[in-house]
């Protein structure tokens, strides 16, 4: 599987989703720009080597994550939005309800496998709640790849952020200003369709802090 990186915007929104609902399981989607045909025989990890860059995060649900009808509605709407913006649904993230549980459960593996049907380099990201602090001193994620029909954890010591110092600084600033209170997930959108799950205000806040 190619390398995986998250932009600061994608990482921050994932962190804010968990911060808004600290006592619930939360999940969401990660989107990447549509890939151009790549040249073959590029050296692995060398100049020009391929990697997937998650440019944004779409928060889905909090609390009950296994409601299939709601997931289908979300996937359909988000897939349509992605096509309009030349994006593709390329990853899935989840934070479990129990603090010390950072392993993918059946829901996580099922949704990630569904995404992998349309995007071969799909990543499953689990949020490690034990590493979560208001200062964001360390990345809080474990990245899993689909290999031989199983989801396997990649090197936990690898830096999966495009710019970790920036992501750390901005996520800490957003947590300090309680920006998570304004974060909208798909559950919030279903409660009131005026709630925008693309979170333009948080996107602006991230850009302003860059």
Curated annotation (Swiss-Prot):
Keyword Membrane: yes
MPN domain span: 4-150
Top-level taxon in the UniProt lineage: Eukaryota
Subcellular location: Endoplasmic reticulum membrane
Keyword Mitochondrion in record: no
Tissue: Expressed in liver, pancreas, heart, lung, kidney, brain, skeletal muscle, and placenta. Expression levels are highest in pancreas and moderate in heart, skeletal muscle, and placenta.
Keywords associated with the record: Endoplasmic reticulum, Membrane
Cellular component aspect of the GO annotation: cytoplasm; EMC complex; endoplasmic reticulum; endoplasmic reticulum membrane; Golgi apparatus; membrane
Pfam families: UPF0172
Membrane topology: Peripheral membrane protein
Listed GO biological process terms: protein insertion into ER membrane by stop-transfer membrane-anchor sequence; tail-anchored membrane protein insertion into ER membrane
Transmembrane intervals: none
Assembly notes: Component of the ER membrane protein complex (EMC). EMC8 and EMC9 are mutually exclusive subunits of the EMC complex.
Family, per entry: Belongs to the EMC8/EMC9 family.
Protein role: Part of the endoplasmic reticulum membrane protein complex (EMC) that enables the energy-independent insertion into endoplasmic reticulum membranes of newly synthesized membrane proteins. Preferentially accommodates proteins with transmembrane domains that are weakly hydrophobic or contain destabilizing features such as charged and aromatic residues. Involved in the cotranslational insertion of multi-pass membrane proteins in which stop-transfer membrane-anchor sequences become ER membrane spanning helices.
Name of the molecule in the record: ER membrane protein complex subunit 8
Gene: EMC8
């Amino acid at each position: 599987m190619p390398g995986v990186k998250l932009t600061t915007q994608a990482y921050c929104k994932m962190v804010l989703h968990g911060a808004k609902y600290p006592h619930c399981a939360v999940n969401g989607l990660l989107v990447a720009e549509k890939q151009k045909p790549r040249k073959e025989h590029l050296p692995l990890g060398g100049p020009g080597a391929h990697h997937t860059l998650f440019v944004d995060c779409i928060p889905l649900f909090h609390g009950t994550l296994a409601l299939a009808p709601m997931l289908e509605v979300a996937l359909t709407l988000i897939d349509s939005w992605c096509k309009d913006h030349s994006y593709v649904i390329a990853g899935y993230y989840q934070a479990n309800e129990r603090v010390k549980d950072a392993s993918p459960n059946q829901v996580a593996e099922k949704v990630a496998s569904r995404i992998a049907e349309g995007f071969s380099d799909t990543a499953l990201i689990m949020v490690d709640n034990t590493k979560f602090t208001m200062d964001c001193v360390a990345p809080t994620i474990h990245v899993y790849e689909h290999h031989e029909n199983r989801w396997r954890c990649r090197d936990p010591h690898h830096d999966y952020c495009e710019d970790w110092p920036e992501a750390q600084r901005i996520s800490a600033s957003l947590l300090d200003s309680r920006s998570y209170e304004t974060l909208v997930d798909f559950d919030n959108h279903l409660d009131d369709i005026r709630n925008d799950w693309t979170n333009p205000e948080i996107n602006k806040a991230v850009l302003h802090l860059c």
